[in-house]
Amino acid sequence: MDFPQRVNGWALYAHPCFQETYDALVAEVETLKGKDPENYQRKAATKLLAVVHKVIEEHITVNPSSPAFRHGKSLGSGKNKDWSRVKFGAGRYRLFFRYSEKEKVIILGWMNDENTLRTYGKKTDAYTVFSKMLKRGHPPADWETLTRETEETH
């Protein structure tokens, strides 16, 4: 999947924080395909990449404002409330995104990997890691800066 692109009427962008994780997953699948072209589809990374595409194309871009994507107070309150998340991969993976209904834009902010699986209370928990990233401003909290950083990479 290349970014930016238009899916279900939404302009879909990837912030560098998401793009880095996504590119690493794509590279892992390409390596698996090169090593074992007959069976790479059975590997966990290949299945995960397929689920990521499905989540983006069939869930996020269909209705980014769905109540199912609200995170409650998992990222704290205040400025982080504008972030949404989708759960997948047996509930262990999270993809965080922001959207603007007015602009019809969705920005994929970050997706956890096998090192940051959802594990409540752990330092490597997806919500804990993403909260720390937001505190450091990468990705940024405000829409204008988020949009600018995203557009600069495309």
From Swiss-Prot:
The keyword Nuclease appears for this protein: yes
Gene Ontology cellular-component annotations: toxin-antitoxin complex
InterPro entries in alphabetical order: Toxin_endonuclease_YhaV
Biological process according to GO: mRNA catabolic process; negative regulation of cell growth; regulation of DNA-templated transcription; regulation of growth; single-species biofilm formation
Known EC number: 3.1.-.-
Keywords: Endonuclease, Hydrolase, Nuclease, Repressor, Toxin-antitoxin system, Transcription, Transcription regulation
GO molecular function ontology, one term from the record: RNA endonuclease activity
Source organism superkingdom: Bacteria
Subunit-structure text: Homohexamer; forms a complex with PrlF (SohA) with stoichiometry PrlF(2)-YhaV(4), possibly as a YhaV(2)-PrlF(2)-YhaV(2) complex like the MazFE complex. This complex is seen to dimerize in solution.
Biological role stated in the UniProt entry: Toxic component of a type II toxin-antitoxin (TA) system. Has RNase activity in vitro. Overexpression leads to growth arrest after 30 minutes; these effects are overcome by concomitant expression of antitoxin SohA (PrlF). Massive overexpression is toxic. Unlike most other characterized TA systems degrades rRNA, and co-folding of the both TA proteins is necessary in vitro for inhibition of the RNase activity. It is not known if it has any sequence-specificity. Acts as a transcription factor. The YhaV/PrlF complex binds the prlF-yhaV operon, probably negatively regulating its expression.
UniProt-recorded name of the protein: Ribonuclease toxin YhaV
Encoding gene (name): yhaV
